[in-house]
């Protein structure tokens, strides 16, 4: 297969109006539209460049002969829901958790799943090596709008949990939408669930003034403090496009995405008497332990929600997700879904009648460390090859090269993988003690440093 030149793990992400210009976006959209030749939905997150890019991709799609349905500014999973149910494809303008200067284009097929490699290569071939279809004047597409999708998405989310039971509990919830697209959904869903809601950063703003879009612990100190000050049952945080949720327990503890995944996995397997769970090679051993206990089967893919989603579809999987808090409920949407995650977590709190900290404490215990190190994109492949060679030649550790280099030791593992959207390597480690996890992650970083210079 030819090497892709534009698409990364999550579509195309670049600095807005630098590399990701209107001209670039329009031609790429025209290339995509030339293949789809149908009705394409578009929408995006709250970034300052999103309206500019939406207009550009609209022009490109119309030029190729596609009709366009503009869904507005809304969460990525709401757009995926709309495409899966009504349209032939979609383009989502988002850079998810990346800093404000970035934006991106995420292309999805008629199921709302990120397009497979062969289609992305076909789009790139049209973009670079030939010309997109340019419709004759009487075949140019038409623009429509659909402003009802958010309400429909919220209603469909609520259908999938026991609303009355959650309402009866009157949970006290603090939600931090990070000024992103979740601002249009999360507060309303929580109110429909009868929660006493306190909002932080729930005014949409593409400059993300309250915090960085990535919901990692250093960025959520205001949320943590508010949960403790108010005596809330739970704190919730979204990334920029609201396709993932991070939880804070009632004591103000940051709950790793793996733990949230494990909680929901356990509940889903209990409710369905087992099933296929799809995750990535970077996910905790706890996911495997729970599957074994509750009749599940785990399938691992490379990192990327579209890979997990496609495997869920191909295997008729029950549930899936990633370690970053992006959980996929395939009977609803083939992609990470912050709103559905929130609703399900609240339902678990109510059904189990236990605080979040206690539910987390009941899960299998592993310790993790997550580090990252800068590395130019053009060196990444060479660095990975040299790391793999060193491990093979100097140790007897097991290697998994599904995505990057995963080194499996008797007391844990470390995965060293290149980011698909940034010039960095991420090193995730897990072990039976925090000290060992820290050591393994630092070792992974040292291997990258050794071979990038």
Please place each PLM-identified region on the residue numbering:
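Gly/Ser/Thr-enriched, mixed-charge loops and adjacent short helices
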Residues: 2, 15, 103-230
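N-terminal small/polar loop signature for handling phosphorylated ligands or for N-terminal nucleophile
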Residues: 30, 34, 40-102, 189-248
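An N-terminal, well-structured beta->alpha segment
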Residues: 1-65, 142-173
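Short glycine-centered, acidic/aromatic-flanked micro-motifs in structured strand/loop junctions
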Residues: 43-45, 175-177, 249, 331, ...
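Phosphate-binding and adjacent anionic-ligand microenvironments
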Residues: 234, 272-453
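Short beta-strand-to-turn element immediately C-terminal to the catalytic PLP-Schiff-base lysine
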Residues: 107-110, 246-250, 328-330
